[in-house]
């Protein structure tokens, strides 16, 4: 607002000029959100996959019944804002045996509540913690629409790693990096994912978003925070710059030299994971916001494209 306070309530009916193809966001070295998601739909068309596009509002209103129509569900690059009904649908879909591919980072992070009578209106409170552009004033952390505590889902006991196996760990808006395969990728349960990819091959050192498949915002594998113990760590990013910083909700003290950037902080990384879920379901997630920007490199003939195509064909 003009007085400097944050906007907690908004509507999709108002013009949103940065939600259009080819818009370059001021934070990103390339594309962001909707226009970055078009990298994925372009790739799906190029590889002749049949697909439907559904919105967050569709999922909120229809729930898991919507997802149950599909053997495999993919997210876009930045599914940051989720309602309680959306999280419940994602979780139930996995329990039902659905195959889920989480292709973003910083997912399922902020509590988002639709107006009970008008789904065109949504409320998001930026609470006392989180990587955020503004902070609600004291006493204004609870939602007006349902009275429940707002802010981060982890504050309500639903940290993203319990939904998608990964948790938001770092962000930086300069250049993107690449992955190196981890020992789990060579196990019989996982090696098929890397058909056509060498054991020592660098993965994703190219792309339209920052020049690499691991960038902008990153998620990590963390058993302490709820990553399933049956999850396989397939690959891990490396060589991030010192402008890639750990998320501030995990910075306990602002002590000089204690928390560093990408060259010295082990929490600054993207982790690629795969695991089985009940009823013959499974989940794959590369843990990076810029991942889909690498799919079209070299006329779609590259190791990022190969990995996702192999995974999707199996699912």
Model regions: which residues?
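Aromatic-Pro/Gly-enriched surface loop or interdomain linker
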Residues: 1-67, 309
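The substrate-binding groove and active-site-proximal loops of carbohydrate-active enzymes
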Residues: 23-33, 71-81, 295-298
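Short, glycine/acidic-rich beta->alpha junctions
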Residues: 36, 65, 80-86, 266, ...
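Loop/turn elements at helix/coil->beta-strand transitions in domains of secreted/extracellular proteins
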Residues: 46-52, 68-72, 95-100, 228-230, ...
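Generic beta-strand/beta-sheet core signal
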Residues: 54, 75-76, 103-104, 236, ...
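Solvent-exposed loop/turn segments at secondary-structure junctions
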Residues: 58-61, 78-82, 106-110, 116, ...
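Short alpha-beta junction capping motif
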Residues: 67-115, 311-314
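Glycine-rich, aromatic-lined ligand/substrate-binding cores of catalytic
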Residues: 118-306, 310, 314
């Amino acid at each position: 607002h003009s007085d400097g306070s944050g906007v907690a309530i908004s509507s999709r009916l108002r013009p949103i000029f940065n939600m259009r193809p080819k818009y370059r966001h001021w934070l990103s070295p390339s594309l962001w959100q909707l226009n970055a998601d078009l990298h994925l739909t372009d790739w799906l068309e190029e590889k002749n996959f049949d697909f439907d596009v559904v919105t967050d509002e569709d999922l909120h209103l229809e729930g898991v019944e919507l997802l149950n129509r599909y053997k495999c569900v993919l997210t876009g690059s930045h599914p940051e804002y989720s309602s309680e009904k959306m999280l419940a649908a994602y979780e139930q879909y996995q329990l039902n045996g659905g195959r889920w591919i989480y292709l973003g980072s910083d997912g399922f992070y902020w509590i988002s509540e639709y107006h009970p009578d008008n789904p065109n209106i949504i409320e998001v409170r930026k609470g006392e913690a989180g990587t955020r552009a503004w902070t609600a004033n004291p006493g204004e952390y609870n939602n007006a629409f349902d009275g429940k505590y707002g802010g981060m889902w982890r504050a309500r006991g639903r940290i993203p790693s319990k939904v998608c196996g990964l948790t938001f760990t770092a962000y930086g808006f300069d250049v993107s990096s690449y992955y190196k395969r981890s020992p789990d990728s060579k196990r019989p349960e996982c090696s098929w994912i890397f058909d056509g990819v060498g054991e020592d091959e660098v993965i994703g050192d190219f792309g339209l978003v920052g020049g690499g498949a691991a960038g902008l915002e990153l998620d990590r594998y963390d058993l302490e925070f709820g990553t399933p113990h049956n999850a396989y760590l397939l690959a891990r990013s490396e060589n991030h710059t010192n402008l890639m910083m750990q998320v501030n909700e995990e910075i306990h003290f602002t002590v000089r030299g204690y928390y560093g950037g990408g060259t010295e902080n082990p929490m600054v990384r993207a982790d690629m994971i795969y695991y089985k879920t009940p009823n013959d379901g499974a989940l794959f997630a590369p843990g990076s916001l810029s991942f889909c920007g690498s799919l079209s490199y070299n006329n779609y003939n590259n190791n990022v494209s190969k990995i996702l195509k192999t995974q999707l064909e199996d699912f």
